[in-house]
Amino acid sequence: MGRLMSPFLLLDEMGPVVYAPGEAIGAPSHPHRGFETVTYLLDGGMKHADSAGNSGDLNPGDVQWMTAGRGVIHSELPQDHMMENGGRMHGFQIWVNLPAKDKMMLPRYQDIPSSDIPETTSDDGLVWAKVVAGKAFDVEAVIDTVIPITMIHLKMKAGATYTHACVHDLSLIHI
């Protein structure tokens, strides 16, 4: 994506894939530095552990927001039930570049369960929104971002419309 999509460095769609027992794969310990990883899971189950002592489970609808800053080593692996039983895995991971002044900040980890992520619907009931980061429909997310980011999971019924006001210099990814 490069300079044209700054601050976004990468967008990875994980799946959708259905794993048989014992087949699910993840990412064993590996380093990151100078950016944030935002993982949003739709199906399946993952577990996180890192060199800063953070750990957490990621279930459908949950968000993991890891700020690597000056550097962190972490792993993202299937939860035990995914390895034992198999199942459907689907989610997204976005890498967000940190501004130069923040690249050496201390690493941090935010694990936000689906139940803590605000949801709302449009007045006509045709648009459902989960406000992961930023603001939509006058609902503000609970996540603390280093740079202003808006991430909204939308479900729209037939005939629905939604307009989101954006500042003129915003980079946008629509999935």
Please describe what each predicted stretch is.
Residues T39-P60, S75:
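A short beta-strand-loop-beta hairpin characteristic of the jelly-roll/cupin
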Residues Q93-A129:
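Long amphipathic alpha-helical segments that form oligomerization/scaffold cores
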Residues A68-K101:
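Ligand-binding loop in jelly-roll beta-barrel domains
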Residues G61, G69, K157-G159:
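Tight coil/turn sites that cap or link beta-strands
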Residues I173-I175:
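Conserved small/polar residues in nucleotide/adenosyl-binding loops
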